[in-house]
């Protein structure tokens, strides 16, 4: 079976209604990256960082995979497909893609800095 590697970024999930980072109305229009996406931000203002990512999780849960996600998943019927994405949402998986590598992590999976075991994002609170 032939192998196909598909690379995706924010555009594929934007069609599902998820905000991108760099568009004029994107996430960086309302947040400074230094305030929510750095180790220093997590150390200095954990509550703001947790609120930012929880907002993104809530947004993601309200969105559905689009035709692009489904088309990529459909390739698995004829090919050995690996999806490599910059996206942190789970729309590829929800569309049916079985092998997805997230280059920037996943909103649905967390790892504690104190305990290497993955934890569910629903259990994370600002003081942890």
List each model region and its residues:
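Glycine-rich beta-strand-to-loop/alpha-helix junction loops that act as flexible
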Residues: 7-10
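Cys/His-coordinated zinc-binding microdomains
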Residues: 116
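Conserved small/polar residues in nucleotide/adenosyl-binding loops
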Residues: 122-128
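Conserved catalytic-core helix/loop/strand module for nucleotide-ribose chemistry
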Residues: 2, 12-113
